[in-house]
């Protein structure tokens, strides 16, 4: 009896102690980690447009101020210039159109040639030096070439050749002593540059058809019929005209020719407000096509 009591005394505390132990918690189901969404694909670069090229902050403010006269976006649209084109700009001068064309073509994978004699390259040279990233890809070549020199734009490679306010210079024999009119040779060389189906775009100061043709040699104006004859004699087909650069206020009859009007204002302060009110010249905008080669039988 005493042994039983002693055994009970030992067992009861152990039982009580065991009763206070907490049963091990049942394992909880693990929550799967949320799947990470794939990173969005980078946005494709915006397709270059003429509108964005014209609106670019890299353009010279003085050039932008002349947009109301020169109308770059509708002019280039009329010529059908695409950002993937190979374009030759003939005699770019101070680079007014170069500031629009170079970024547009660079962004689209196109190519720009600036074609001018040594004395006509300073504007493009300044652009290239000031902003190599934007203008460094411009290929500067000679034009027109004389004395049997080889053309520097490979034949049949250009999608478009553009020249702004220059045909009258060739007709006048500008800076070409002893060769008063080299326009025929200039058009022949342009024709050779273009691919079959390529575009020649011309903008120039328009002389009325009723005016004396001799004024083409002194006034800076030239007749549409003269330009068409030069182009068509070189083999081009006339593809249309636009009045986007027309100015009915310009009579083309001024004391110092077209240079009487802005931006030249050759008379300085004499009648300055009168000529500013007229604005820049009345200009033709003509498009020509180099015909596609006829398939041989």
Segment roles from a protein language model:
Residues 251-297:
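Core SAM-dependent methyltransferase catalytic element
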Residues 212-241:
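Conserved Class I S-adenosyl-L-methionine
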């Amino acid at each position: 009896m005493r042994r039983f009591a002693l055994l009970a005394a030992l067992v009861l505390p152990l039982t009580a102690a065991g009763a206070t132990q907490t049963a091990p918690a049942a394992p909880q189901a693990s929550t799967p980690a949320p799947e990470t969404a794939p990173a969005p694909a980078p946005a494709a670069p915006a397709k270059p447009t003429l509108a964005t090229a014209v609106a670019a902050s890299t353009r010279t403010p003085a050039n932008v101020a002349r947009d109301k006269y020169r109308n770059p976006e509708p002019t280039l649209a009329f010529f059908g210039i695409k950002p993937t084109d190979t374009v030759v700009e003939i005699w770019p001068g101070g680079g007014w159109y170069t500031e629009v064309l170079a970024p547009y073509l660079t962004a689209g994978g196109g190519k720009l040639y600036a074609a001018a004699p040594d004395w006509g390259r300073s504007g493009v040279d300044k652009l290239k030096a000031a902003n190599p990233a934007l203008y460094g890809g411009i290929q500067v070549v000679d034009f027109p070439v004389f004395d049997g020199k080889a053309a520097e734009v490979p034949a049949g490679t250009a999608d478009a050749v553009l020249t702004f306010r220059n045909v009258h210079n060739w007709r006048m024999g500008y800076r070409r002593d002893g060769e008063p009119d080299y326009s025929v040779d200039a058009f022949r060389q342009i024709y050779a540059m273009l691919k079959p189906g390529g575009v020649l775009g011309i903008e120039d100061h328009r002389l009325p058809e009723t005016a004396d043709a001799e004024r083409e040699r002194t006034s800076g104006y030239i007749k549409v019929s003269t330009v068409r004859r030069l182009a068509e004699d070189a083999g081009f087909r006339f593809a249309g005209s636009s009045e986007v650069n027309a100015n009915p206020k310009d009579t083309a009859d001024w004391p110092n020719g077209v240079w009487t009007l802005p931006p030249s204002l050759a008379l300085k302060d004499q009648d300055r407000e009168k000529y500013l009110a007229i604005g820049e010249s009345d200009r033709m905008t003509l498009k020509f096509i180099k015909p596609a080669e006829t398939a041989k039988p």
